[in-house]
């Protein structure tokens, strides 16, 4: 009976020592800096452009394409739903007219 109490006390002491060591390591850790991304906005809504046509400007087309010539999603481009659909249709039209490749070689 006496041995069990001593063992329990020893275990409690070791647990307390471990928790103190953990607290010390937690204090050494530096907090991550708060990082806020700039809110993405629809370029076309900002300038009030309703019709999207990329036939004249090939550099504007490449802004909405990935390195593998795929159409970038809304979360990357920042377009609203309506303008993203217009961009996708304009890019498909540009592909059909052979202004943009279907896939990157």
Curated annotation (Swiss-Prot):
InterPro entries recorded? Ribosomal_bS18, Ribosomal_bS18_CS, Ribosomal_bS18_sf
Which cellular component terms (GO) are annotated to the entry?
A: cytosolic small ribosomal subunit
Which residue intervals are annotated with compositional bias (Polar residues) in the record? Answer: 9-23
Alphabetically sorted, this entry's keywords are: Ribonucleoprotein, Ribosomal protein, RNA-binding, rRNA-binding
Q: Which domain of life is it from?
A: Bacteria
Q: How does it assemble?
A: Part of the 30S ribosomal subunit. Forms a tight heterodimer with protein bS6.
Family, as annotated? Belongs to the bacterial ribosomal protein bS18 family.
Instruction: Please give the name of this protein.
Output: Small ribosomal subunit protein bS18
As recorded in Swiss-Prot or TrEMBL, the protein's gene is named rpsR
């Amino acid at each position: 009976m006496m041995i069990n109490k001593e063992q329990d006390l020893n275990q409690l002491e070791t647990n307390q020592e471990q928790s103190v060591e953990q607290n010390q390591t937690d204090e050494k850790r530096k907090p991550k800096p708060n990082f806020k991304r700039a809110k993405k906005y629809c370029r076309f809504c900002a300038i009030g452009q309703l019709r999207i046509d990329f036939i004249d400007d090939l550099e504007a087309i490449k802004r909405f394409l990935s390195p593998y010539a795929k159409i970038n999603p809304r979360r990357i481009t920042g377009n609203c739903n309506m303008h993203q659909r217009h961009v996708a249709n304009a890019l498909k039209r540009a592909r059909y007219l052979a202004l943009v490749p279907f896939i990157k070689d």
